[in-house]
Structures are given as C-alpha cells and as structure tokens.
C-alpha cells in the first residue's frame, strides 16, 4: 500500500485515481481504496472493478446521475488511457452483475442475456492463484497481432452458450476446455511463464479437474477450475466461487 498527499491532481502517482479525478475535476478530497485481490496483473479485471467502483462512489457523493451502462462506458473510455489494449468485456462484465452472456454489437449497443445458474448445483468453480502477476499489455498486444486466430473462439462461445440453454453442463465444460486450447494457440505469450505451463499441465492431468482455463489475458493471475461439487483435489490453495443470478461470492478453502 502507498499513501499519497498532493495539491494537484496531475501530481497523483496512482494512474487510475489520477485519470478518474481529472475527468470529474473535483475539489480536494480524501480517497481510500482497498482490495481483496491484486489490483494489477491478476486477470480478474481488477482495474475495471476499481474504476467502476470509484466512478460510482464519485457519482453518489456528488449527486451525479449515471446509469450502470453509462458507468461501464465511462470506465472503458478512461481505462483506455491506461491500457490501449483493454477490451469491452472487463468493464461491462464487472459493472453489471450476474452470470451472463454479453453481446457487443456494431454501433455500440451492448446486450446482456442473464443465464440460469443450474450448472453450479452440480459443479464447483474455483480460482487458483498461479503466484504470477504481469502487465497484460504485452500479452494483449501479442493477441491483437494474431486476431485471425481469435475468430474460432467466437464460434466456441456460441456453442458453449447453446449447451447451457439445453442444460447440458458436461458439453458446456467441454467447450470451456476447448476455448482454453484455442486461446493458447493464439500466441505463445499466453503461457510464456514456466510456472503457468507447469500448473496448466498439472490441472489437465488431475482427475478431479473437469475443466480449467487461465483468466484474463493470460501468462499470470488465476486459473478458473471446475470440478464435481465438493470433489476438487489439487495441490494448490483455491477459492470456491459461489454463483447466484445476482453475482458471485468467494470462499477460501
């Protein structure tokens, strides 16, 4: 943690705080920010969560009326100033809670399809920290340079969605694994770190793990791991994520 006290917004070292305060042009104030996850390099969209929470807090304190979608849009625009390779999915995924499919359409329209959480009656979902944090810019730049390799993922997303609509959980988890293999094939930067490759192989070979993938851009952060309920047996600490239609809750195991 780091404490800053400045007379001018431009002198603030915390880039996220500086960008948001500069946008609103607020008078002097005290800002205290805490997090239960790494604020950078976790692959959990923590930067977007920070920005959205900060914008929401400022709007409430200053009686600025903003819809959730307006907050997501502003968060995306401000985050672009920090990372030109950031995507829509982080702010729009964090800013609107729940288990959902998001469609980003031409013209800027964003559509949400909120999904049944029946999957989680049978399967547990865990986060497993790799011990590796990274700046996502380099990974995302490498992915951007190989966009033609990303396109097959779009079809896989639709197939996974169709599986959920048919309440075919096993098929959905099959496509989750398939999407991870497709993601790795886009660029070697996704699994460049040796620790990531070792853990990936260990999870793939573990009989209690039904599906897994690395969250976020790749090459660090957390693995998302699925197992039968109360049946995960891996040599790593994990956090079980309880999913409801309204959002998620984490429980350390």
Residue ranges and their predicted role:
Residues 23-42, 70, 74:
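Glycine- and acidic-rich phosphate- and metal-coordinating loops
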Residues 43-66:
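DPxDG-like acidic metal-binding loop motif
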Residues 41-51, 87-100, 217-220:
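FAD-binding core of FAD-dependent oxidoreductases
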Residues 1-25, 58-65, 73-84, 91-214, ...:
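C-terminal nucleotide
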Residues 13-17, 46, 50, 54, ...:
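Generic hydrophobic, aliphatic-rich segments that mediate packing or membrane embedding
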């Amino acid at each position: 943690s780091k404490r800053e006290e400045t007379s001018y917004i431009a002198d603030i070292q915390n880039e996220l705080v500086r960008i948001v305060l500069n946008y609103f042009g607020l008078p002097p104030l005290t800002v205290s920010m805490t997090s239960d996850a790494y604020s950078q390099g976790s692959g959990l969209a923590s930067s977007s969560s920070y920005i959205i929470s900060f914008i929401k807090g400022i709007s409430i304190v200053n009686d600025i009326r903003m819809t959730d979608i307006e907050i997501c849009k502003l968060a995306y625009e401000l985050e672009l100033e920090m990372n030109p390779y950031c995507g829509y999915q982080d702010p729009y995924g964090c800013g609107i809670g729940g288990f959902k499919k998001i469609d980003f359409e031409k013209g800027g329209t964003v559509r949400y399809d909120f999904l049944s959480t029946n999957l989680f009656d049978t399967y547990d979902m865990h986060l497993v920290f790799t011990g590796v944090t990274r700046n996502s810019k380099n990974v995302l730049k490498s992915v951007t340079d190989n966009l033609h390799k990303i396109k097959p993922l779009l079809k896989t997303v639709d197939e996974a969605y169709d599986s959920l609509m048919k309440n075919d959980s096993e098929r959905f988890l099959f496509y989750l694994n398939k999407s991870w293999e497709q993601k790795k094939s886009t660029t070697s930067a996704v699994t460049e770190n040796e620790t990531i490759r070792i853990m990936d192989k260990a999870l793939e070979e573990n009989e209690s793990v039904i599906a897994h993938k690395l969250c976020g851009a790749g090459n660090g952060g957390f693995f998302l791991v699925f197992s039968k309920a109360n049946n995960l047996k891996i040599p790593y600490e994990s956090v079980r994520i309880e999913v409801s239609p309204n959002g998620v809750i984490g429980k350390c195991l």
